[in-house]
Amino acid sequence: DYMFYFQGEIMSQKAVKRLYLMQVGSMPEYQIPIVCYLVQTEDGKNILIDSGLPEIIPEEGSDFENGQDVIEQLASLGLKPGDIDTVISTHYDLDHAGRHAAFTKAQYVVQRGHHLDAASNPRYAATRPQWDQPMDRIRLVDGDTELLPGLELIETSGHVPGHQSVLVWLPKTGAILLTVDAVPFSEGFTRDEQDDGSNPDAEAIRASTIKLLDLVEREHIGLVMFGHDQEQWETFKKAPEFYE
């Protein structure tokens, strides 16, 4: 079957080997998990997606609670902070960029629009020491970007300007979409109008949601992981287990 052969050829060129899921904290009152992801490539690269909460949570983050942080979880996989080659920043919120500075050898990858907005936005002031790194260590991307074969960044503004979701292609599992905060809960993954008009970013959120729904249909994505969905999260394999 030529088509099957051809698809096999395409899949064999994908560089991603494993995906680990780590819960690094929570919002106990709302039963919401705070999570990071680790992608390992066939050629031994370690790519972290987000870094969780800061070690010391500032006052405005009083709803958050640290669990086993990203550094401890990586250690349980035999990895030190210096082993991380790349940190993908989905966005600079407190619960996503709180440990960026620990990864002293990594290149940070972020949407240009988000990084530029963050510079003057008080929302990201608390995490600024984490994400405000020398520019030679930051790779700014513009819109949807294939970072490497099997790892794609999907621009999904709305939750914040320049938010990005991540599409991972695994050899056995196939495609997994990490929506992150573009769609934090499964019930939000719908084409229906959801907002009562009170959210100024409702239109952008809706556009990004529809963009991801279209992507899932077009690429036949079998698994969509929402950013903060406790019920769904409980069904997943967590590190040290992995998806491959």
What are these regions (language model features)?
Residues M3-G61, K211, R218, T235-E244:
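Zn-dependent metallo-beta-lactamase
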Residues Y20-M22, I47, I88, V109, ...:
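Hydrophobic/aromatic beta-strand patches that form the interior of the parallel beta-sheet core
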Residues H100-T104, L170:
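Short, conserved loop/helix-junction motifs that constitute active-site signature segments
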Residues E29-I32, S157-P161:
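A short catalytic or substrate-binding loop motif that flags glycine-/basic-rich loops and adjacent residues
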